[in-house]
Amino acid sequence: MSFWKVATLWQMPLRPSILVQVRTATKRAAGSRTSMKDSAGRRLGPKKTEGQRVEVGQIIMRQRGTRFYPGENVGIGKDHTLFALEPGWVRYYLDPFHTGRKFVGVALYQDMRLPIEHFAPRVRRFGRQLLSGKEAETEEQALPRSVFLAKEKILERAQQRADAREQRRAEFGHILREELGLALDQDAEQLATEYLLRVQTNLKSGFNSADARFNAMYHMEVRMRNTPEKVGQMDLLKKTVASVDAATSFSNKFELGRHISEGERVAWREALHKDLAGLVIRTAEEKQRVVERLKEASKYLSLSEEIHLRRKFLKPVKPETEAVAEAAGKGTVTIKRFNYGTGKVDTIIREKKAFLAKL
């Protein structure tokens, strides 16, 4: 063996070790070789009992495994320790929607029981509690910054809506008195205009006529029952609403007018279809005839029916199978369109009667 090989082997133990110590998050406790490995854990069990007061972060239960599950306002740690998320009172309870599980929760009020109803909103404090009644009242009246900055605009728009409602009530009262000839005293007219205003609001929200009238009547009855000084006006309300329903109807543009029965609507619709059947608009006179005929359509037809008829008889542009001219002239319109099939620009010459706006 050569000298250099012997020197190299002699220096190998002197080299620094490549082993690096790794620190872990937990430390295993030291124990004797003969100690029992299955001995019971120490310092486990409930730390707070039923009805006991707890603060945020206080430990309620130490356990190995989920013997108890976290309920309302209770959190669970990685070692299954249950702790309070809100200040309150400890409750041990069972949840019928989770059979076989025992829960620990924190009630925010001393007389509050858990669990609350399954579909009821949760009672939460978000980690904050105002012990002073004056501070709590101030906090309730406080507005978010965005709302505070827009407060003037919000109040202004609310006042504008209130003024618009009063104006509509005045218009309804004028129509009932002057156009429909309903003889109502002051109290009955107030009830009638309020009822019609609510019916109009429901119609704008998408309800049909029957549902809109039912909802308006139901709302007024409930509010009248909850107001002791107005309970005596219940008979007057029913009588007024019956007379108003028999004398009024709303158009599809939400305009108030005389009552139109279902028979009248069907007869008007059939007469309109008979009058316009097979009509092809070629002149301005024919166009004006259709416009005049559809003027009262909003009173007899629903909005969808009126739109369907207008699209059928008042088409802005006729299909290209009609009113196509052979050569350009004074009464024609030239249209240039790119043809993606041929890659060229096609020239289409159409008569002016093909366009409704040019008649």
Swiss-Prot record:
Function of the molecule: Component of the large subunit of mitochondrial ribosome.
SUPFAM superfamilies: Ribosomal L27 protein-like
Organism placement in taxonomy: Eukaryota, Fungi, Dikarya, Ascomycota, Saccharomycotina
Chief place where the protein resides: mitochondrion
Record-linked InterPro entries: Ribosomal_bL27, Ribosomal_bL27_CS, Ribosomal_bL27m_C
Lineage: superkingdom: Eukaryota
Official protein name in the record: Large ribosomal subunit protein bL27m
Entry GO MF terms: structural constituent of ribosome
Subcellular location: Mitochondrion
Keywords carried by this UniProt record: Mitochondrion, Ribonucleoprotein, Ribosomal protein, Transit peptide
Family matches, as Gene3D superfamilies: 2.40.50.100
Keyword GTP-binding: no
Matching PROSITE patterns: RIBOSOMAL_L27
Transit peptide: 1-24
Disordered: region residues: 29-48
Gene Ontology biological-process annotations: mitochondrial cytochrome c oxidase assembly; translation
Skewed-composition ranges (Basic and acidic residues): 35-48
Entry similarity comment: Belongs to the bacterial ribosomal protein bL27 family.
One GO cellular component term: mitochondrial large ribosomal subunit
